[in-house]
């Protein structure tokens, strides 16, 4: 019994270690520059998304469909994943819902809502939707 417990513990450590290595490899593939998400009707509603800021979150949290094991994660609108048109469609396949679903931490809004207690700056729309910080990042990425 003792050897069984020790063996199971060793196997669980190996599995946890390999998961961490996988996340590190995924993080290395992530884009270094901020990405402007242009799915709103107004440029003021665009979002500057920086993968580096979100490096402690597993890629699968947002990119829940990987196109192929050897290919990096696809954009939300690739392969018609969240391509339903219309800014406020209640369809789970709409881009609006992918970003703004309230009751899940798989969406930007849901995750920020969950973390707002530790990070009060996560509340409201402006932290994402072309806030001063987002405008600075947009200007900096255009210069590069």
UniProtKB/Swiss-Prot annotation:
GO biological process, one term: anaerobic respiration
Extent of the signal sequence: 1-24
Processing and modification events after translation: Binds 4 heme c groups per subunit.
Entry keyword set: Electron transport, Heme, Iron, Metal-binding, Periplasm, Signal, Sulfate respiration, Transport
Entry binding sites for heme c 3: 54, 108, 111-112
Quaternary data: Homodimer. Heterotrimer of cytochrome c3 FDH2C and formate dehydrogenase FDH2 alpha and beta subunits that forms the FdhABC(3) complex.
Family statement drawn from the similarity comment of this UniProt entry: Belongs to the cytochrome c family.
Name of the molecule in the record: Cytochrome c3
